[in-house]
């Protein structure tokens, strides 16, 4: 039975991944911001186990999680949680920059470092759900894009460092996906939201699982996804 830890499982791509793994009878570990959200996740995915840590507080994740029972082995660690605020560079506050970098970049680095022994034990797989903004930085999303460019660099360094330990690393770059974040960003940009013009989170989850299911002699290092026609 595979063992998988997911951040951001409350909605969107993270929830779709959790549902897909649950349908396969896999062991799920879901990270929640607080106890209330952890209870919601356990109710939605009854066989899951939850961990509680606030990804927006750098440096506190390790201390919080080391006080909880952690998996002894991990087949995959999936970084899906993310935040985004729109605004021009001259408009974004230092707090927005700090929060965005904390959740989207620093937390994945800290969490991965903490769980490397469990990943090495099972020759596991780390998946970073990035964004098209991690390839081409659009206007009015500078903090988000900067965090995603940094996440790309983190993945590349980790891949080189952990190759000898058999840990595989994949970065997924989804195009526009039908998630609450996209709905909110369209509202901030004053754009109409058309769900049919977006990929479903389930489609992105299926692509991620394809990367996880590859034989050991192959690694999908980067996965670009765009809405179909």
Name each model-derived stretch:
Residues 136, 157-167:
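Active-site-adjacent segment of SDR/Rossmann-fold oxidoreductases
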């Amino acid at each position: 039975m595979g063992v998988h830890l997911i951040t951001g499982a409350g909605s969107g791509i993270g929830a779709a991944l959790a549902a897909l793994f649950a349908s396969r009878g896999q062991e799920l570990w879901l990270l929640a911001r607080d106890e209330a959200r952890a209870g919601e996740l356990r109710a939605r995915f009854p066989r899951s186990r939850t961990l509680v840590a606030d990804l927006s507080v750098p440096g506190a994740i390790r201390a919080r999680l080391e006080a909880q029972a952690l998996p002894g082995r991990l087949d995959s660690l999936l970084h899906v949680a993310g935040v985004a605020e729109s605004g021009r560079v001259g408009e974004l506050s230092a707090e927005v920059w700090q929060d965005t970098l904390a959740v989207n970049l620093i937390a994945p680095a800290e969490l991965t470092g903490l769980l490397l022994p469990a990943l090495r034990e099972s020759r596991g797989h780390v998946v970073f759900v990035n964004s098209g903004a991690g390839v081409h930085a659009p206007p009015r999303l500078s903090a988000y894009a900067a965090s995603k460019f940094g996440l790309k660099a983190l993945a590349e360094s980790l891949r080189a460092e952990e190759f000898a330990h058999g840990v595989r690393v994949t970065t997924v770059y989804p195009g526009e996906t039908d998630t609450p974040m996209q709905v909110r960003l369209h509202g901030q940009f004053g754009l109409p939201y058309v769900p049919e013009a977006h990929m479903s989170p389930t489609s992105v989850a299926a692509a991620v699982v394809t990367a996880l299911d590859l034989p050991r002699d192959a690694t999908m290092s980067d996965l670009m996804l765009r809405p179909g026609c």
